[in-house]
Regions:
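Conserved, structured core segments of small domains
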Residues: 1-93
Length: 93
């Protein structure tokens, strides 16, 4: 099953320096999740500080569990919106 995960950096509670110091670990963990097929695609958001991820997982619980292993998430620096996706019916016969 696929999910869209929208993240928002909690910039009202954390400084840019606090985010910057964790970037190498965040990137490393995101690469590991990508390598195992959990993260399918990832983009930076253009509207606010955060990211948009296309995720492959069995359940929303699993999505939250694995995203919770990101260093920003472990530090409480992110908010997540998780949207379950289903196939577009317009492309079905």
């Amino acid at each position: 099953m696929q999910f869209l995960a929208l993240t928002r950096r909690r910039t009202e509670n954390f400084s840019e320096a606090e985010f910057t110091s964790r970037v190498p670990a965040e990137v490393g963990r995101a690469r590991a999740l990508y390598a195992e097929g959990f993260i399918r695609q990832v983009w930076h958001r253009a509207d606010i500080a955060g990211a948009c991820l296309l995720i492959e997982a069995d359940s929303e619980e699993r999505v939250r569990e694995k995203l919770g292993t990101l260093p920003f998430a472990e530090a409480g620096m992110l908010e997540f919106t998780i949207v379950p996706l289903k196939p577009y019916a317009g492309f079905c016969p």
